[in-house]
Curated annotation (Swiss-Prot):
Protein name: Ninja-family protein 1
Biased composition (Basic and acidic residues): 156-170
One cellular component (GO) term of this entry: nucleus
Pfam families with a match to the protein in the record: EAR, NLS_NINJA_AFP, TDBD
Region entry Disordered, spans: 1-27, 155-200
A single GO BP: signal transduction
Swiss-Prot/TrEMBL keywords: Nucleus
Family assignment from sequence similarity: Belongs to the Ninja family.
InterPro entries per record: Ninja_fam, Ninja_motif, NLS_NINJA_AFP-like, TDBD
Compartmental location: Nucleus
């Protein structure tokens, strides 16, 4: 109703006063255009005065209405150090003056060297130069719980401790190796059975007993070597080993038993005095002492040859004995002269048969084996050869 109020007095009593100024509402009414929105908009106003001040349009985004707030920067904090620099600096100034606080404090404790004096503002970069120009500007002081001198000494102690530990490890390792070597030496000596002194004493006893034996023990006619001072059983084994090595060199005479029996008979013909002495001394010695004793008797070359031949003969004897056990034995039967010859099959593969006769040890075919029995040539020799169930050993 304010816009439609009238002045009923019509300016009575105003005199020559200037005309009243127009109110802002009247100016707005004159300036505004005709509104055609029917007052249905969000900012419309219902009532008589439709052209009054409208409400501001609300927004769904709150940031558009709020002005950016500037957050003030936090105040700069002074740099913290584990060493009380300012307190010690004030103490040094109080005791020695302004010109001596930059040097190390002498005393019973640790010496601390100050790099810069912090100003009142607490900013370490803006250090003021106080003293004799020993303070560095624009540099930060080293932060550490211990001075550099203590750290250097700690590193040296650590290195020394590591070196001592490595030396102890090397000593323990060396002792372990020495203990292992000593144990190995002791076991080898125990395996030998006797010390070298005891072996030499035993050999001296045998040599003194051998002087009473007749020198006829050495028989070089058959090419065999007999060891002095040993009982007949040892001599028989040595001669059998030599004969077996000779049989291995000559396969035609491999299965002759006459040489071994003759050598055993000749070895048993040793005088009774030698048998008595050797039987007394030999059983008292251990078996391991026979090897060094035989090595000292006779020439070294003959003894080494004898040992190697005996070892080979023992090995070959086992192999040949096993082969003979696996091979079937044969013998002749039904011949005209009635003779019987025994042997065994050496090879019996396809189309090849070899028979070894026991009497001479020769390798023969079936026809030759029948002729060897004295029957002459036969049309079918396999009819006169019979395979036995057990081998002829």
């Amino acid at each position: 109703m304010e816009g439609f109020s009238r002045d009923l007095l019509c300016g009575i009593g105003k005199g020559d006063a200037p005309p009243p100024e127009k109110r802002p509402g009247q100016l707005r009414e004159e300036m505004e255009e005709v509104e055609l929105s029917l007052g249905l908009s969000l900012g419309g106003r219902f009532g008589l005065d439709r052209k009054g001040s409208k409400l501001p349009r609300s927004s769904s985004v709150a940031a558009m209405l709020t002005t950016p707030v500037e957050v003030p920067a936090p105040p700069s904090l002074s740099r913290a150090s584990s060493l009380p620099v300012q307190a010690e600096a004030s103490e040094v100034e109080r005791k020695q003056g302004l010109d001596g606080w930059g040097s190390c404090r002498e005393g019973g404790g640790l010496g601390v060297q100050h790099a810069a004096r912090l100003p009142a503002s607490g900013n370490p970069s803006s250090a003021s130069s106080v003293g004799e120009g020993q303070i560095l500007q624009g540099t930060l002081m080293r932060t550490s719980s211990l001075p550099a001198v203590i750290e250097a000494s700690g590193n040296d102690d650590w290195k020394k401790r590591k070196e001592a530990q490595s030396l102890k490890r090397l000593e323990v390792k060396k002792k372990r190796i020495e203990r292992r070597n000593s144990l190995a030496c002791n076991t080898s000596k125990e395996a030998a059975g006797q010390s070298p002194k005891e072996m030499n004493a035993n050999t001296d006893k045998l040599v003194s007993s051998d002087e009473t034996i007749v020198s006829a023990n050495e028989s070089h006619s058959s090419g065999k070597h007999l060891v002095k001072g040993l009982p007949p059983k040892y001599q028989a084994t040595i001669t059998s080993e030599d004969s077996s090595s000779a049989m291995r060199k000559k396969p035609n005479s491999a299965f002759k038993g006459t040489a071994i029996t003759e050598e055993q008979n000749s070895s048993s013909s040793v005088p009774s005095s030698g048998e008595a002495i050797s039987s007394v001394t030999a059983p008292s010695l251990p078996l391991l002492s026979l090897v060094p004793i035989t090595a000292t008797l006779g020439s070294r070359e003959d003894q080494s040859i004898l040992g190697r031949a005996g070892a080979r003969a023992n090995g070959m004897g086992d192999v040949e004995r096993r082969m003979m056990q696996e091979m079937p034995g044969v013998f002749t039967k039904g011949l005209s002269n009635g003779s019987r010859v025994e042997g065994f099959l050496y090879k019996y593969s396809k189309g090849e048969v070899r028979i070894v006769c026991i009497c001479h040890g020769s390798f023969l075919t079936p026809s030759e084996f029948v002729e060897h029995a004295g029957a002459g040539k036969v049309d079918n020799p396999l009819r006169h050869i019979v395979v036995s169930a057990t081998p002829n050993l």
